[in-house]
Swiss-Prot record:
Lineage, top ranks: Archaea, Thermoproteota, Thermoprotei, Desulfurococcales, Desulfurococcaceae
Binding-site list for Mg(2+): D74
Protein name as annotated: ATP-dependent L-serine kinase
Annotated GO biological process: chromosome segregation; positive regulation of sporulation resulting in formation of a cellular spore
UniProt function note: Free serine kinase that uses ATP to phosphorylate L-serine to yield O-phospho-L-serine and ADP. Can use ATP, UTP, CTP, GTP and the inorganic polyphosphates triphosphate and tetraphosphate as phosphate donors, with a preference for nucleoside 5'-triphosphates, but cannot use ADP. The catalytic efficiency is highest for ATP. Is specific for L-serine and cannot phosphorylate structurally similar compounds such as D-serine, L-threonine, L-homoserine, hydroxypyruvate, 3-hydroxypropionate and DL-glycerate. Likely contributes to serine metabolism, including cysteine biosynthesis.
C-alpha cells in the first residue's frame, strides 16, 4: 500500500450467497437512518437512479420496537436518493434485526502517512487527546468504549481521543478532509485482527480503534433522530440481496 489521497477498503474474503427476495414498498418517511449521508455519494447515486429509471437493489430495514417506523440497516444512500428525487416509496427487505445470523461490527480507520496534522486539527476542535501509558490496556472493547477513538501507531505510539458519537463525527470528518487534501492514504478495515496485523507488519502507520456499537444502541440512536458518522456500522447479513431493478414508476 502506498500513495496519498486514496481510500482503501480491506475486508476478509468470505463467500456470502446471493438470494432473491421480493422487495416490499415502504413509505420513505417511515424510515429512520442511523448513519450520516455523504453528499457526494448521494449526488452520484441520484444521477444513477434518475438515468437508469430503476432502484437496482432493495434497502434492508427492520421494525423499530414501540414506534411505527423502520430502521435503515443497509442502503442509507439509496433511501436518501429516492427521497431527494421526490418519490414516496422505496423498495425494501424487512429483516429480524436480532436474528443471530445478522452480525454487527464496526469499521476501523487507519492511515498511511503522518498523523501530526490530524492531531493538530483534532485539538483545534477542542477535543481532548492524551497519550496512553500502555496500548495493551486500551485494546479491549470495554476500554475502547470509554473513548471516541484510541489511536495506536507502529512505534508503540498511543493516543486516547476523549468523547463519544459527536467526537467520532468530528474526527471522521477531519480524517476524510485531510485524505482529500493528500495528507495520507486512508484505509478502512472490516476486521480488527487484520488491522492490528497490518500495523505490526508496517503496512499502515496508525490505526483508529473503537468499540463496535450494539444493535440496541443503533436503534436508540435512530429513535433519538441522531446518526453515527459514515462507516461506523458494518452489518453482515446471511445473504446478499439479488438485483431486482424496481422501476421508479412504482415508487410514486
Amino acid at each position: 500500500m502506498s500513495g496519498k489521497g486514496k481510500v482503501i477498503i480491506k475486508l476478509p474474503k468470505t463467500v456470502i450467497p446471493v438470494k432473491h427476495v421480493e422487495p416490499v414498498l415502504i413509505d420513505v418517511d417511515k424510515l429512520l437512518p442511523h448513519e450520516e449521508i455523504v453528499p457526494g455519494r448521494l449526488k452520484d447515486l441520484m444521477e444513477k437512479i434518475r438515468s437508469e429509471g430503476v432502484v437496482d437493489m432493495p434497502i434492508i430495514v427492520t421494525p423499530i420496537p414501540g414506534i411505527d417506523k423502520y430502521l435503515v440497516v443497509d442502503g442509507h444512500h439509496r433511501w436518501a436518493a429516492v427521497k431527494e428525487l421526490g418519490y414516496k416509496k422505496v423498495p425494501a427487505i424487512i429483516i429480524d434485526y436480532f436474528d443471530e445470523n445478522v452480525k454487527l461490527k464496526t469499521w476501523y480507520p487507519a492511515i498511511i502517512g503522518s498523523i501530526n496534522k490530524l492531531l493538530e486539527e483534532i485539538k483545534k476542535e477542542g477535543i481532548r487527546i492524551e497519550e496512553c501509558k500502555g496500548k495493551d490496556d486500551v485494546l479491549k472493547d470495554e476500554e475502547l468504549g470509554k473513548y471516541a477513538f484510541v489511536i495506536i501507531g507502529k512505534n508503540n505510539e498511543c493516543y486516547k481521543i476523549y468523547g463519544s458519537i459527536n467526537e467520532q463525527k468530528i474526527v471522521s470528518k477531519i480524517l476524510s478532509k485531510l485524505n482529500l487534501e493528500g495528507e495520507y492514504t486512508l484505509v478502512y478495515y472490516g476486521e480488527k485482527d487484520e488491522a492490528l496485523r497490518d500495523l505490526e507488519e508496517g503496512k499502515i502507520d496508525y490505526l483508529f480503534l473503537r468499540k463496535p456499537p450494539t444493535k440496541n444502541e443503533v436503534i436508540e440512536i435512530a429513535k433519538r433522530n441522531q446518526v453515527y458518522s459514515p462507516k461506523t456500522t458494518r452489518h453482515i447479513l446471511p445473504y446478499i440481496p439479488a438485483i431486482t431493478n424496481t422501476p421508479l414508476d412504482k415508487l410514486k
